[in-house]
Amino acid sequence: MSNPTSSLESSHFPVMLEEVIKICSPGQGGIFVDCTFGGGGYSKRFLKFSKTKVIALDRDSLIKKISLKLEKQYPNRFFFYQRKFSEVNSIVGNKLADAIIFDLGLSSIQLNDLKRGFSYRSKEKLDMSMGLTETSAEEALNNLTEQKLKSIIKILGEEKDA
């Protein structure tokens, strides 16, 4: 896939977008936090309401390209941070957010780009990291102790017999 960000941007449809919009009522303005920016579906929809501001986060450095378009289109209304959503508190701080949205799960951009190493269908290296600067699965398997791998699989993989 030559340009995974453009394909994600045009093909990703956020889960339950209209239901989220209905519940959040962005037409009245406010600050909305998109903790899993990805292709920008939620952020773009919230920004259609002229009184809204969006703070968006994504740990994947490829996503920055998509965010730049929105920063240009919505100056002083769209703010992107290349960070993990677990850091949302340090980013939002004491600002009162009207809603915080998480579209959890793997991103299409990561699954569809074979170089990211999430698929067993290709001969690419095993990466499986959410961001490009993180430790790959291949590095973890080759460098972590057996005990550490068991612990990771047991806790994060919820596999009690690891």
Where are the regions that the model predicts?
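S-adenosyl-L-methionine-dependent methyltransferase catalytic core, i.e., the SAM/SAH-binding region
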Residues: 1-162
